[in-house]
């Protein structure tokens, strides 16, 4: 069962079958990353219809750069302008930062000087040490570095004030274009800077990353692997160092050798994120402290050269320290980069060393193997040169592996290709990526603590087809890694979003259900225990874990800890051997019973593209008389649903009410239909409904009208009422508390019981369209949904002449179907 690992981790989820007992609420992280929830956007298939209103095709970097050169102007980014809106969103500040381009800050600006390396990064006054620690790791891999930071950029050749950087975003690489205006105070960069006063690649990279997330403030507080994954597209793994395996040093060394990025930290007892301020310190206080820090520095304002010279060193200031500095020089709640591992002969034995870097560019470890440690004199000169030992305050230092595991609590490794760390051989894993969404009221079912809704979460079938090739392992086992990542939570902070507490469970699919892609129902999860699951539900962007299971078919159920939390995610599965991972999607269909003999079809107005095709939904024998024209109706009696001696009391009641309201033409309009339906429905006190609205009745007429008259005759009305009666029984079945509403999570089963089989996206759409703010669906909305489903299925089948599931409509037909519905 999942376990609690810190204050920011949810407690263990509900017990598996046969293990009783409730579980407490998950505790929330005290980090300032937290905020309120925010719903995600609607599916792109729906929102695309508004692209002509909101969509403007973005120009590429090359197009914008060329345009600026032709017009001889410097680029100004309209999406991330050089003003306070790009800085902070939580409040407005009286302090005025001055946005300057590098040529306005110094005389000889350079993008990169002598290659981009980890000493070029010095943290500014923003709590993004986690991001800068990842940059330091990135500089160790030139191939990755050049992909993130295109090097064909300059302040000299073809300079136009425009730069671009590339990041991995949820399965694809995106190019982020920015201008080079940077926030300054007293002609000093406020945020990230380089050791060289005239080098700006790190400051511009930070700006591009801030644009990606909406503001600089959005970067305050995070996990190093979040940025590592955005730099590489890799997958992260977390290790609690106190529970580290015996070969942890070997794991770290192999990770360094194959180019994986690593970061580490010391828990402060409250936060799972680094660079966050303590409780009670808001952004205003942070900025005030920052300004005092700058104003009280050794370099006074009056001494500042407004432009500066290239030879002057960067004015480095230790950031506002809301992390906790320890006597040994290390900092709690702060992210470090792991930049190297080595072994050195020392006094007759080999000592394991770890090299770390503080993104501040200073404040270093002062214990054994630190820069100024006296026993360096016992190390051979060549060994010191090989280890690049220097007594400089650059934030980088060596320490023994024993001291490392004693002081540090967490290690984060970003694997570029998900190679097996436990193996002596590097192996390339296969990967599958699935995008998904939790929709409140439909597919946001929460963890298995909530059995009534857990089954509604998105489900993904995983087929492990081949066992591992491990000669030392006699078990028939498949190794794989599952990584669940929630999307856009940091970007939406200014809208009140925060990271959800997320996790997943893995169930084995019974053999008799192999190949069946149907969504597993509630009873399956009530009587089957999971085969594997994430250790914890935790409020981090990504939760990942390795597993070893026999070849078989499984279902992965990703979820938030609490139900009703709406958001988007991606689920990645890495395996050593071939695997198939895909979302469980029901086939879209409607039950079509065998057509009854001696029954003439009712041809509806939406069916006229195929007027000789019979109605493909449930048909009653009394519907077979057809409909005469309005003129003939006045001259001849209306066909009866059945002989009078066979009519039930209810049918006679309908006939009498219908005659009273319809008038001589024996047809009713929407207002009259409302009166008829509500007169009958009000007699059913157990429904507890306020009746049907006028708009609902208009939809019913539009979808049941056979000749486009805008009215219903008795036969059409009777067909409608037979449907309503059948659907009413379904509604009562799921209205267990007799409140007159059903829970939107039950709508999936209700729709299925009515003979409509939909996929997950359509269930989501039904919830968004028909559920109220409490995620309940009343009788009126319930019937309207079913009427529309029947009408749209019927229309589709009428146009699908060859039965291949594809139709082609011209604009007139499309508008007829959508406007008269």
UniProtKB/Swiss-Prot annotation:
Pfam families: Calpain_III, Calpain_u2, CAPN13-like_C_EFh, EF-hand_8, Peptidase_C2. It catalyses: Broad endopeptidase activity. Residues 649-683, 692-725, 722-757, 787-821 form the EF-hand domain. One of its GO terms (molecular function) is structural constituent of muscle. Ca(2+) 3 binds at residues 735, 737, 739, 741, 746. The active site is at residues 129, 334, 358. Its main location: cytoplasm. Isoform I is skeletal muscle specific. It is found in: Cytoplasm; Nucleus, Nucleolus. GO terms for cellular component: cytoplasm; cytosol; myofibril; nucleolus; nucleus; plasma membrane; protein-containing complex; T-tubule. Belongs to the peptidase C2 family. Homodimer; via EF-hand domain 4. Interacts with TTN/titin. Interacts with CMYA5; this interaction, which results in CMYA5 proteolysis, may protect CAPN3 from autolysis. Interacts with SIMC1. Interacts with UTP25; the interaction is required for CAPN3 translocation to the nucleolus. This is Calpain-3. It comes from Homo sapiens (Human). The gene is CAPN3.
């Amino acid at each position: 069962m999942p376990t609690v690992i810190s204050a920011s981790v949810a407690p263990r989820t509900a017990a598996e079958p046969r293990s009783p007992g409730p579980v407490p609420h998950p505790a929330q992280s005290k980090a300032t990353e937290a905020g309120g929830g925010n719903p995600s956007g609607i599916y792109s298939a729906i929102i695309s219809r508004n692209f002509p209103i909101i969509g403007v095709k973005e120009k590429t970097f090359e197009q914008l750069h060329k345009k600026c050169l032709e017009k001889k102007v410097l680029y100004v980014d309209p999406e991330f302008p050089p003003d306070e809106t790009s800085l902070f969103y939580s409040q407005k500040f009286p302090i005025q930062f001055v946005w300057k381009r590098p040529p306005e800050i110094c005389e000889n600006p350079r993008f990169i000087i002598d290659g981009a390396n980890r000493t070029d990064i010095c943290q500014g006054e923003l709590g993004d040490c986690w991001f800068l620690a990842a940059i330091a790791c990135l500089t160790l891999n030139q191939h990755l570095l050049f992909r993130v930071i295109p090097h064909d950029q300059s302040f000299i050749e073809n300079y136009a004030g425009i730069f671009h950087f590339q990041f991995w975003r949820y399965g694809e690489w995106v190019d982020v274009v920015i201008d080079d205006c940077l926030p300054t105070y007293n002609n000093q960069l406020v945020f990230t800077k380089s050791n060289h006063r005239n080098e700006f690649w790190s400051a511009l990279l930070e700006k591009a990353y801030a644009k990606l997330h909406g503001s600089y403030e959005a970067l305050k507080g995070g996990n190093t692997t979040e940025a590592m994954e955005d730099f590489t597209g890799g997958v992260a793994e977390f290790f609690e160092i106190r529970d580290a395996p015996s070969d942890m040093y070997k794991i770290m060394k192999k990770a360094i050798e194959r180019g994986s990025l690593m970061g580490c930290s010391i828990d402060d007892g409250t936060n799972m994120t680094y660079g966050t301020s303590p409780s009670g310190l808001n952004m205003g206080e942070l900025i005030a402290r920052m300004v005092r820090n700058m104003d009280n520095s050794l370099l006074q304002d009056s001494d500042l050269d407004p432009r500066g010279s290239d030879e002057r060193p960067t004015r480095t200031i230790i950031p506002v320290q809301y992390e906790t500095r320890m006597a040994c020089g290390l900092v709690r709640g702060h992210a470090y980069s792991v930049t190297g591992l080595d072994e050195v002969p020392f006094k007759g034995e080999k000592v394991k060393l770890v090299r770390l870097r503080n993104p501040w560019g200073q404040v270093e470890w002062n214990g054994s193997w630190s820069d100024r440690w006296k026993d360096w004199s016992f190390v051979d000169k060549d060994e010191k040169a090989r280890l690049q030992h220097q007594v400089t305050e650059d934030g980088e230092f060596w320490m023994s592996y024993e001291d490392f595991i004693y002081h540090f609590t967490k290690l984060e490794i970003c694997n570029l290709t998900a190679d097996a760390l436990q193996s002596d051989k590097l192996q390339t894993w296969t990967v599958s990526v699935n995008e998904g969404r939790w929709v409140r009221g439909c597919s946001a079912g929460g963890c298995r603590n909530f059995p009534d809704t857990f089954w509604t979460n998105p489900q993904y079938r995983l087929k492990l087809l081949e066992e591992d090739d491990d000669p030392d392992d006699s078990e028939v086992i498949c190794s794989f890694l599952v990584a669940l990542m929630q999307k856009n939570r940091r970007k939406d902070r200014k809208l009140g979003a925060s990271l959800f507490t997320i996790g997943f469970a893995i169930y084995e699919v019974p053999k008799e259900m192999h190949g069946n892609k149907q969504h597993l129902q509630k009873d399956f999860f009530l009587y089957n225990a999971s085969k594997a699951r994430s250790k914890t539900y935790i409020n981090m962007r990504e939760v990942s874990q390795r597993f070893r299971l026999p070849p078989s078919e499984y279902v992965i159920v990703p979820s938030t800890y609490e139900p009703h939390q709406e958001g988007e995610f991606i689920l990645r599965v890495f395996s050593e051997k071939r695997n198939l991972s895909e979302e469980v999607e029901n086939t879209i269909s409607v039950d079509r019973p065998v057509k009854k003999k001696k029954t003439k079809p009712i041809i509806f107005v939406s069916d006229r593209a195929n007027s000789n095709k019979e109605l493909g939904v449930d048909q009653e024998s009394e519907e077979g008389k057809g409909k005469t024209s309005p003129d003939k109706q006045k001259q001849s009696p209306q066909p009866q649903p059945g002989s009078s001696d066979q009519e039930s009391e209810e049918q006679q009641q309908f006939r009498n009410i219908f005659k009273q309201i319809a008038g001589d033409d024996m047809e009713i309009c929407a207002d009259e239909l409302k009166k008829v339906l509500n007169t009958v429905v009000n007699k059913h006190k157990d429904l507890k409904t306020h009746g049907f609205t006028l708009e609902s009745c208009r939809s019913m007429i539009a979808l049941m009208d056979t000749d486009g008259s805008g009215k219903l005759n008795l036969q059409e009305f009777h067909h409608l009422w037979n449907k309503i009666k059948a659907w009413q029984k379904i509604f009562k079945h799921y209205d267990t508390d007799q409140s007159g509403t059903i829970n939107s999570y039950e709508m999936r089963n209700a729709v299925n019981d009515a003979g409509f089989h939909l996929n997950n996206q359509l269930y989501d759409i039904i919830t968004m369209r028909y559920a109220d703010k409490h995620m309940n669906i009343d009788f009126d909305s319930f019937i309207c949904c079913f009427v529309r489903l029947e009408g749209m299925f019927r229309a589709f089948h009428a146009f699908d002449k060859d039965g291949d599931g594809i139709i082609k409509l011209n604009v007139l037909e499309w508008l007829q179907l959508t406007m008269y519905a």
